[in-house]
């Protein structure tokens, strides 16, 4: 990748109902001024301005980075994120518009006569615009589909989503929110590349996917944070916590419009940097007592969740201890071993003082020292078995998806408002990195999740960047009441009847006290891409309640 560190690709959505508005065509809108590029303050200027507050701790850490990566400052520049060009569609083009202010104004009495809002949360600034997508127009799937935007009117943020109803039993099957990672990669990548109802071939044509996860669940694919995929804003989001408020608002307004889906079980799934997103997003939902989001579990695939436990396993995975031949020579492996103690010390400082001033140096040093040697080989960081080809994200199919999603008739059918689509926005990737989000200990939220819902961590075992060794390690190290019994639980075979009608072992699983870890054989970072049948098998089993203890 042509950035400081590897961007994690995801790697890594429904009928009429209440609060439906009768829409009238507005007068012709006035021309919108050309959006101005958004200049994000140089994070290193911010460091210098306030460094004295953390001099003893952060000063030593930063000196360490400068000693070991002396050219790092010359490679850093203030970030200028160009505002996306867009054309706002008139309200008359949308099938439904749900106003957060209408929902926030609803009060009810509880059993004791105490009045409270029907739905918790600050929703007044949000609207949800929804378009019914004609399935015959794009030929992606025959099921009912909706697309649209969540508008944060107070902050000029507009998040795009695309919903597909279940192919099986829409009013009985669960609903899943799918999130790709990056940070900065579109969830439509996961939709077309991994687990959605269709893939895009070299002729830029949609092909039916028999192993789509909407075989037995309805799915919302969400482009977040803002300025990812079809989403847009004049503002920037640079941390996971800020993004959580928007996701809660979208789900709340979506299930308000489509009550028939709100009664179903709801799950959040994602991969890669979604290992950061999902613990925060799930915690935000569970924080509210009065909600219409029936959250039942979360699924994280090949995620980055606990860097302190995961970073020690870059060297083993690259050097032949992860089940595949070594990618690096002995000198490079030794160099990674030598760098590890300093890296872990820096991550520990980030965990102790969660700030840009401690977390950013850890990201810079550790990613250069432990990911950099592998990156220089030209091997695919998402699959140790292959070389990186096609583009910076190593898969030529991603170019097909981008070309398809930039077709005017596709954008028109979906009600898209931006002028163009890109699969990953590396400015967002760097923005999250420069604000210290990368190394923060979001795994600390998982124990409180486990007290209420099951958590699945799965990992394709050929991935380097968020490898199965590190994911297994952090789940076994997690401090929660079931820690000891989970850590000592044996790995057991995962089996399925394959396409030849034979019983096949496709992975291993261990589970206790609501926490489950799966290793999926012969799959890389994007597990459903490499192992579509096995992925659908374990997803269906999980969503049906297998391994759940709450």
Swiss-Prot record:
Molecular-function annotations in GO: serine-type carboxypeptidase activity
Residues bearing carbohydrate: 203, 216, 289, 387, 493, 514
GO CC, one annotated term: fungal-type vacuole
Disulfide bond found in the keyword field: yes
First-level EC class: hydrolase
Pfam families: Carbpep_Y_N (PF05388), Peptidase_S10 (PF00450)
Catalytic activity of the protein: Release of a C-terminal amino acid with broad specificity
Primary residence: other
Keywords: Carboxypeptidase, Disulfide bond, Glycoprotein, Hydrolase, Protease, Signal, Vacuole, Zymogen
Leader sequence residues: 1-18
Family affiliation: Belongs to the peptidase S10 family.
Function summary: Vacuolar carboxypeptidase involved in degradation of small peptides. Digests preferentially peptides containing an aliphatic or hydrophobic residue in P1' position, as well as methionine, leucine or phenylalanine in P1 position of ester substrate.
PANTHER family the UniProt entry points to: SERINE CARBOXYPEPTIDASE CTSA-4.1, SERINE PROTEASE FAMILY S10 SERINE CARBOXYPEPTIDASE
Name of this protein: Carboxypeptidase Y homolog A
Native organism: Paracoccidioides brasiliensis (strain Pb03)
Gene: CPYA
């Amino acid at each position: 990748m042509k950035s400081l560190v590897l961007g994690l690709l995801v790697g890594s959505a429904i009928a009429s109902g209440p609060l439906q508005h009768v829409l009238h065509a507005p007068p012709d809108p006035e021309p919108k001024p050309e959006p101005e590029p958004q200049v994000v303050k140089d994070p290193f200027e911010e460091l210098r301005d306030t460094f004295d507050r953390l001099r003893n701790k952060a000063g030593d850490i930063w000196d360490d980075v400068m000693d070991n990566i002396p050219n790092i400052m010359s490679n850093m520049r203030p970030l200028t994120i160009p505002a996306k060009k867009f054309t706002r569609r008139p309200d008359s083009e949308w099938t439904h518009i749900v106003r957060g202010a209408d929902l926030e104004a609803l009060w009810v009495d509880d059993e004791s006569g105490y009045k409270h809002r029907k739905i918790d949360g600050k929703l007044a600034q949000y609207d949800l615009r929804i378009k019914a997508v004609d399935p015959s127009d794009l030929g992606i799937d025959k099921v009912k589909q909706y697309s649209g935007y969540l508008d944060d009117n107070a902050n000029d943020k507009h998040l795009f989503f695309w919903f597909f109803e279940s192919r099986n039993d829409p009013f009985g099957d669960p609903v899943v929110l799918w999130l790709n990672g990056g940070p900065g990669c579109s969830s439509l990548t996961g939709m077309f590349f991994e687990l959605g109802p269709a893939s895009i071939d070299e002729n830029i044509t949609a092909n039916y996917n028999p192993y789509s996860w909407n075989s037995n669940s309805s799915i919302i694919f969400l482009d977040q944070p803002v300025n990812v995929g079809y989403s847009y804003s004049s503002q920037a989001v640079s941390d996971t916590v800020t993004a959580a408020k928007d996701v809660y608002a979208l789900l709340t307004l979506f299930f308000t419009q489509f009550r028939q889906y709100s009664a179903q079980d709801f799950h959040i799934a994602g991969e890669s940097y979604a290992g950061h997103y999902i613990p925060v997003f799930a915690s935000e939902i569970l924080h509210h007592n009065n909600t219409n989001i029936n959250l039942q579990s979360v699924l994280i695939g090949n995620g980055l969740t606990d860097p302190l436990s995961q970073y020690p396993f870059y060297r083993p995975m690259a050097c032949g201890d992860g089940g595949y031949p070594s990618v690096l020579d002995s000198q490079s492996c030794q160099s990674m071993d030598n760098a590890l103690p300093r890296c872990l010390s820096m991550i520990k400082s980030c965990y102790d003082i969660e700030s840009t001033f401690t977390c950013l140096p850890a990201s810079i040093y550790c990613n250069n020292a432990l990911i950099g040697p592998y990156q220089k080989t030209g091997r695919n960081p998402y699959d140790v078995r292959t070389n990186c080809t096609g583009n910076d994200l190593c898969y030529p199919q991603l170019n097909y998806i981008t070309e398809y999603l930039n077709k005017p008739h596709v954008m028109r059918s979906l009600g898209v408002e931006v002028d163009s689509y890109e699969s990953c926005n590396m400015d967002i990737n760097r923005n999250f990195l420069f604000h210290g989000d990368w190394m923060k200990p979001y795994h600390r939220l998982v124990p409180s999740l486990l007290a209420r819902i099951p958590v699945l961590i799965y990992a394709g075992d050929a991935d380097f960047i968020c490898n199965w060794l590190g994911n297994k390690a952090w789940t076994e190290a997690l401090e929660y009441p079931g820690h000891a019994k989970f850590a000592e639980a044996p790995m057991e075979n995962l089996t399925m009847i394959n396409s030849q009608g034979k019983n096949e072992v496709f992975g291993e699983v261990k589970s206790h006290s609501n926490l489950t870890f799966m290793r999926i054989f012969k799959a890389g970072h994007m597990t459903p891409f490499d192992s579509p049948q096995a992925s659908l098998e374990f997803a269906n089993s999980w969503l049906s309640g297998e391994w759940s203890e709450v």
